[in-house]
Amino acid sequence: MRRAEALAALRVLDIRPADVQFLALPDQGLTDLLLRDCDRALTRITRVIDDWSPTDILAPSLFDIHPDHNAVAVMMRLIFADFSAPRISQWNYLVHGRSAAFFDRSAELSSSESETAKKREAIRCHRTQIKLSKRRFLRYAARPERFLRVERESAVRRDGAVYSVSRAHDNLDVDLRFSVDPFRMPRNKFFILGRDSLGRTRACQIRLPSRSADLKVLDCATNRSVGIARYRGHPFAGEFTLPLHLFSPIHDLFIKVDRRSWFFDEAGWIEIPGVPSLANVAPSMISAEAYSLAAR
C-alpha cells in the first residue's frame, strides 16, 4: 500500500517507476536498526549509490525530529565516511522540527504556484500516511524548501537537551539541560554510536537518572554492560563522563538524547568529529579544550 502511494506521488512529480528503487527498510524501526544491526543496510545503500553514480544526494537532516529520518541521516554520514566520492554533493533537508542548527545555515528555495500545487497533489497520494494529519501535511507544500550542504567543518552543533559536549582521546564529557515536559521526562536515554578499532559500527546506551549516580553503559546489540559512566545532576540538568574505549578515536561519533513523545524525538543526532591521530598532530593540539563544543 505505502509503496503504491509513493509511486503515485512520484508520478505526479514526473518521476518514472523505472527510476525508483525501494530498500524495504522497517517503518518506525530505523533507529533500532541503526543501533543494533545497521552494517547490512549500509552495504545495501552503498551499492545503490555506486550503481546510480549520482551527482547530488538529498537525505534527511541529523536534526529532523522524526526518528526514522534522523537515523537515515546518521547512516548516510557513516557511508560517506568510508565512500570515496568527491564529485557527489550531499544536501540535507528537514521535514519535522524547528532546529536552529538547521534553519540558521540552510539555503531557501521558494516554489512557484504551480510547483506548490504539484506538491499538494503528490502529498494527497500518501493517503494512509496523511489520514490523521492531512491539514498539517498539506501545509508543508506551501513552505519554502530548505537545503543544507553537508560539509565537514559544519558537522557539529549542540541541539535539544545537549548543551555542550567535549571529546578527548579516551572520554566524552556531556552537559545536559532538560526542558520541562512531563511526557518526555520519565524516558530519557542517551545513545552514542561510532566505529571501533576494526571499523565496525558500535552503539551504546545509558538510561539517564534524575539524580547523581554511576550508570551502566550497555551495548545496544547485546544489552551487556561494557563500562560505567559517572552522572552528576538532577531532573532538569546533568553532566557525565563517558569512557570511549570501545570507539576508534579517529572516527566521528554520533550522540542523541532519546526523549521521544509519541512519534517524534525532542531533537535529532549530533555529530562529533574524531580526534586527530597523535602521530600526525603536535602535542599542543591534543588537549580536550581543542575539541570543546560548548557555547561560550
Give each language-model segment a name.
Residues 84-105:
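Short, flexible loop segments at boundaries between secondary-structure elements
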Residues 100-153:
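A conserved mid-domain beta-alpha-beta active-site/ligand-binding segment of alpha/beta enzyme cores
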